[in-house]
Amino acid sequence: MAYPGHPGAGGGYYPGGYGGAPGGPAFPGQTQDPLYGYFAAVAGQDGQIDADELQRCLTQSGIAGGYKPFNLETCRLMVSMLDRDMSGTMGFNEFKELWAVLNGWRQHFISFDTDRSGTVDPQELQKALTTMGFRLSPQAVNSIAKRYSTNGKITFDDYIACCVKLRALTDSFRRRDTAQQGVVNFPYDDFIQCVMSV
């Protein structure tokens, strides 16, 4: 069974360029990368960034383009999506993965924001999710639209938060769906950990 939000699985995000960014010396064992300058400007000596630092990094990089910078809660979601060791931080390689994902989602948002208002409506959200490979019931899409829209419009920041949460929950579900049947059975405590970690 193919899962949305994974490269090669029909959706979720698209590989993208990394854009221009100042380079810099790498942490030991890492080669220089164009994104390193943004990352190193906010990372501590441990080579990790938390949600506050990620917010500063993304704001300084201008990845949001003409849209409002990401709020702290969206940055927390981004960190949790890639926080495989549950440290509450991300390293440079995770940051590069996030950068590629964000660029893909940003391009996707732009393609559905046809009036260039900086928002999409619930119908456009449904189309966007479908083209990313998410096969959701109308009831699920309605719940998502209610959660992420304000006055019937979904901002870029909320769109990204929605994409992050869908990917993180899909990843969590996928790890438990070992038979790839689209159905899982797991303990309540495990469910709470899955949902509360994103």
UniProtKB/Swiss-Prot annotation:
Matching PANTHER family: CALPAIN, SMALL SUBUNIT 1 A-RELATED (PTHR46735), SORCIN (PTHR46735:SF7)
Originating gene: SRI
Organism: Homo sapiens
Record-listed Ca(2+) 2 binding positions: 113, 115, 117, 119, 124
Leader sequence residues: none
GO cellular component: cytoplasm; cytosol; endoplasmic reticulum membrane; extracellular exosome; membrane; nucleoplasm; sarcoplasmic reticulum; sarcoplasmic reticulum membrane
CDD domains per record: EFh_PEF_sorcin
Positions of the EF-hand domain: 29-64, 70-103, 100-135, 134-169
Subunit structure: Homodimer. Interacts with GCA, RYR2 and ANXA7.
Protein name, UniProt field: Sorcin
Additional remarks: This protein is encoded by an amplified gene in multidrug-resistant cells.
Domain of life: Eukaryota
